[in-house]
Every structure is written in C-alpha cells, then in structure tokens.
Curated annotation (Swiss-Prot):
Principal cellular location given in the protein's record: cytoplasm
Keyword Heme set for record: no
Physiological role: Modulates RecA activity.
Family: Belongs to the RecX family.
UniProtKB keywords: Cytoplasm
Protein name, entry field: Regulatory protein RecX
Any one of the GO CC terms: cytoplasm
Record's signal peptide: none
Species lineage: Bacteria, Thermotogati, Deinococcota, Deinococci, Thermales
C-alpha cells in the first residue's frame, strides 16, 4: 500500500526539496489522495519531509537577492504554512538592501533603485534608508 507513491516521492526529494503542499499535489495527481497522504505521513515520520527545514533552506539560498516580503510571497505560493513562514523569515535589514543596491547597475537613479529594491521585497522604508546610506558613502549615487 503506497509503496509506489513513497518510492516516487523519494525520487523527487532526492533531486530537490519540496514543501508538503507541493509534494502532496504531485502525489495526489499521480496516485490519489489516500496514497498521497499515506506516503507523506511515512516521509514525515522518516524525517525526509519537513516544511520548516525546507523554508529555512529556501530563505538561505535566496536571501541575498530578495527581501522578506518577496521571500514570504514565494514561500506561501509554495504552500508553506504561514506560521512556519513567520518563524523562518528574517527581518528586513538595511545592510542587506544596501548590498543588493550595490550590485544594481542603475543605482545612480534613485527612483529606479528604490523600485528595484521594492521589487526584491524590501519595504519602502528600508529601501529609502539604504539609498540614504549609499549617498552618504559617496559611491556615485545621486
């Protein structure tokens, strides 16, 4: 019972991490709801499926490019429960926004740079503060 679903799930997880919701959808589409739930239960019992670990790894690999709002939206879109998202997300830090801004090629244009940071999930206040610090550093910002 469910050994095919379990084997399929293990093959998927061997390639990359999945949230419980995404893996459940993949398994349910192929094997049905009952087998999917049974396989997910076994995976959780064996320690191969953990939304907190998935969310932490997801944030670690993308935190340099995206701010907390963007990361939150991406995690929620992948079916990670909101309480897990709130637990693993870091606070928006001005230093991170400034580091992202330094890599942006249109950083001399304030409006574009602030929009760029907002698009990466940084709140407006953090984006503006990063812009102000960049001006103080005198790195060619206008």
């Amino acid at each position: 019972m469910g050994s095919e679903a379990l084997a399929y799930a293990l093959r998927l997880l061997a390639r990359k991490g999945y949230s419980r919701a995404v893996l459940r959808a993949k398994l349910a589409a192929r094997f049905g709801e009952a087998e999917a739930e049974a396989a997910l239960g076994r995976l959780e019992a064996m320690g191969y499926l953990d939304d907190r670990a998935y969310a932490r790894a997801f944030v670690e690999t993308r935190a340099r490019r995206y701010g907390p709002r963007k990361l939150r939206a991406l995690l929620l879109a992948r079916g990670v429960p909101e309480e897990v998202v709130e637990e693993v997300l870091p606070e928006a830090r001005v230093e991170e926004a400034l580091a992202v801004l330094r890599r942006y090629r249109h950083r001399e244009d304030k409006a574009r740079a602030v929009r760029f940071l907002e698009g990466r999930g940084f709140p407006l206040g953090v984006a503006l503060e990063a812009w102000r610090l960049a001006q103080e550093e005198g790195e060619g910002y206008k």
